[in-house]
Amino acid sequence: PYEKIGAELVKEVAKKTDDVAGDGTTTATVLAQALVKEGLRNVAAGANPLGLKRGIEKAVEKITEGLLATAKEVETKEQIAATAGISAGDQTIGDLIAEAMDKVGNEGVITVEESNTFGL
């Protein structure tokens, strides 16, 4: 029964990450899986589940604060191209994304579809 709860939790984490950020689902899934595994191990060893929950919540708060403190705004076309290029693993794709974002503006929508053709 605990494994099913853990699997549902990991699935929910991946979906929420995709909905909110659109990226990072693999990282979120690995982190959630580790939290569930270690949490169950600690509870089985006698740890207080509510104490674990409070500890996880405090850790999340501190990590979030740290990330927000070091986060940088991505504003220029060049910054967008560099960031998108890193994310895509291909600078040409990053440049195309930056160009598309430049054309549609901050409120615009860009739709990306898979293609069976090779190259761009």
Curated annotation (Swiss-Prot):
Locations listed in the record: Cytoplasm
One Gene Ontology MF term: ATP-dependent protein folding chaperone
UniProt GO BP: protein refolding
GO cellular component, one term: cytoplasm
Quaternary state and interactors: Forms a cylinder of 14 subunits composed of two heptameric rings stacked back-to-back. Interacts with the co-chaperonin GroES.
Name of the protein in question: Chaperonin GroEL
Family per record: Belongs to the chaperonin (HSP60) family.
PANTHER family the record matches: 60 KDA HEAT SHOCK PROTEIN, MITOCHONDRIAL
Enzyme Commission no: 5.6.1.7
Organism from which the protein derives: Mycolicibacter nonchromogenicus (Mycobacterium nonchromogenicum)
